[in-house]
Design a protein with these regions (language model features):
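Conserved PDZ fold ligand-binding element
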Residues: 116
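A flexible loop/linker signature enriched in serine peptidases of the S9 family
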Residues: 122-125
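Catalytic cysteine-centered active-site loop
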Residues: 39-40, 63-113
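Sec-dependent bacterial lipoprotein signal peptides
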Residues: 1-19
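Post-signal-peptide N-terminal segment of Sec-exported extracytoplasmic proteins
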Residues: 28, 36-73
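Conserved small/polar residues in nucleotide/adenosyl-binding loops
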Residues: 130-132
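Bacterial Sec signal peptide processing site at the extreme N-terminus
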Residues: 15-38
Length: 132
């Protein structure tokens, strides 16, 4: 009897441990992806960062406003800061200079979707623009 009881307890334990290993694929919001694809004028592939594309599409048409970081108006560093918070749950500083300090350098050939790209003006060599 004790032998059977220990088998039953082991079987129940195994069942619970295996059931906790179950994972499911993330749900895709096909409507939001289709809308983002149309708004951005691009094809969004299965392996693309869907959350980034959907969030980015929401900002199309927002006017430029120096120092802005909301849908009433934004500049490039404000947009990057908001998208990183929304998509990656990462809080970046508000200024391009600070965002550069918080970043790790990556070679051009190793750039991946979601990496930050910084631009300088040719004349002054000062940081002037940031993009994802």
């Amino acid at each position: 009897m004790k032998k059977y009881l220990s088998y039953i307890v082991a079987l129940i334990g195994l069942t619970f441990s295996l059931s906790s290993c179950h994972t499911s694929a993330p749900r895709l919001d096909y409507k939001a992806l289709a809308k983002a694809s149309v708004r951005m004028g691009i094809d969004i592939n299965k392996e693309d960062n869907h959350k980034l594309y959907i969030a980015s599409a929401e900002w199309i048409g927002v006017p430029y406003r120096a120092g802005g970081d909301n849908k009433r108006g934004t500049d490039c560093s404000g947009l990057v800061s908001q998208l990183y918070k929304q998509v990656y749950n990462i809080r970046l500083s508000r200024s391009t200079d600070e965002q550069l300090k918080e970043s790790n350098k990556v070679s051009r050939r190793n750039l991946r979707e979601g990496d930050l790209v910084f631009f300088t003006s040719r004349a002054s060599k000062k940081l002037s623009l940031i993009h994802i």
